[in-house]
Amino acid sequence: MTTLSFELPDGSTVEVDVRRLLNAGYAGRDQTEVQAHIDELAELGVPGPEVTPALYPVAPYLAAQTDAVPAQHGRTSGEAEWALVITGNGPDDVLLTVACDHTDRALEVHGVAWSKNANLDVLGRQAWRLTDVAGHLDQIALLGRVGAEQTVIQRATLAALLTPAYWLEVLRGRGEASAGTVLLSGTIAMIEGVDQFSDRWEAELIDPVLNRSIRCAYSVEQLPDPIG
């Protein structure tokens, strides 16, 4: 079982055994824009979901706090996201951190759920209690960067995505709002003209109200060609 460890702003550490990992998809707050994105993907051969927003169960062992992600080929890339981590039963037991959902784009055209289970979900090593940021979530910025030059490929505030409160209600309805559940938010649009197929990805949450940030970063290391 994967165990994640998070440092909180007060210096304390919280550990959680990951029992359930879920990746939200097509989770923009403006579902009209989401549908336009689905139509664009369909032209590229990526099958659309039957309903939006979507929610994809992912093998819990794919949740990782790591500096390197192995990839089978050169057509994989990250997605900057936030993540909810439930550590207990109380309101202060829901943590918010940054995450990067590394996705197999070659497999994605055959099935989004398959692509989500082909690579790691990388999470930050720090977290904030959701109760501490709930009042200004929409002001928190989410950025994705690629390459050694840290070129910005994704930039928005959390106002672009469905809220943690929305997803907590979904989890309660599914009986999954319990310790060990980790949910990634779904991502924001990529900036046109920036190559997503990079050997380095990072994601960052920036809180301008409390003047702090959380970051995760990793190299993408392509596996050797198979024999046989």
Regions found by a protein language model. Name each.
Residues 1-182, 189-228:
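Catalytic-core "active-site belt" of small-molecule-metabolizing enzymes
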